[in-house]
Amino acid sequence: MQSKKKWGLAITLAMVMLVSTACNSTNGGASSNEATSTSGNGSTPASAKTITLGFSQVGAESGWRSANTKSIQDSAKEAGYDLKFSDAQQKQENQIKALRSFIQQKVTVIAFSPVVESGWDTVLKEAKDAGIPVILTDRAVDSPDKTLYKTFIGSDFVEEGRKAGQWLNDKYKDTQEEVNIVELQGTTGSAPANDRQEGFMELIASNSKLKVIASQSGDFTRAKGKEVMQAFLKAHKKIDVLYAHNDDMALGAIQAIEAAGLKPGVDITIISVDAVKDGMQAAADGKINFIVECNPLLGPQLMEAVQSVVDGKDIEPRIVTDETTFTSEQAKEALPTREY
């Protein structure tokens, strides 16, 4: 009996030592990992946790916007981020409501593409006070306080307008007749609408023969582009050029031009911005003469910026995307391998 008791005690002690060793080994492993990924106070940094990204999109008004949304959703999934997505349906009040919801949910980072440029200071200050960094994508905000956001990722819209104006200048540099231009603007008050107009007007100002005879918002939609172009055609007997701030408005305008018995790209020269697939197809078909690219695939750059902000790294206040331009012939060549 004494022998059995000794064996029982020995087995019990062995088991206790084994469990103790296993627990110490587990804790030791965690401590080792924390040494390379935690801050000095021993807490786990945000980069080691699941990053929650609150993103408020303008809407789904165009093919460009759809491609932009998909790029962000796919990139967030690939990065392993928890994406909270909100569609503002092109209304600033919806977007402000979404940003405040993100603040209440205590997301890690907020990113959004502003519907319009102004009116953001109050909600951005709320995010700053809550310690939530903000990243702007595609569109900028008009605010004197640049500390309200970490960076702005997107195109140089003024430069896009300049490219459109430069091409038109070159096309009509030797003309002796007045060239009547109509302009389909984007959403009133939005950064791309303001800037694309500014850059375009800056470049054509050097040619006194180039005259903008009408300019109206088509709200970046195909339906509105068609509607406004119909009004232009009724109001003006001679239209030589259409400058559209995006492909969808240009495509709507093409429908109106064809319905009026005219040939788009021949009777009326058409310049557009975006270079999405439908626009590129129209260019390849000769219906759009010149397209300035605006790259919607901002997802990878956004996720990289989010990670840098979370890790406390320095980040450029302005990140400009690389873009090009397409004539009809160049669009025809590029179309088969076009990603969007």
Positions of predicted regions on the chain:
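A residue-level marker of the well-folded mature domains of exported/periplasmic proteins
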Residues: Q2-K6, C23-Y340
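Sec-dependent N-terminal signal peptides
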Residues: K6-M15
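Methionine-biased hydrophobic packing positions in alpha-helices, especially
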Residues: M15-M17, M249
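C-terminal motif of bacterial Sec signal peptides marking the signal peptidase cleavage site
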Residues: L18-A22
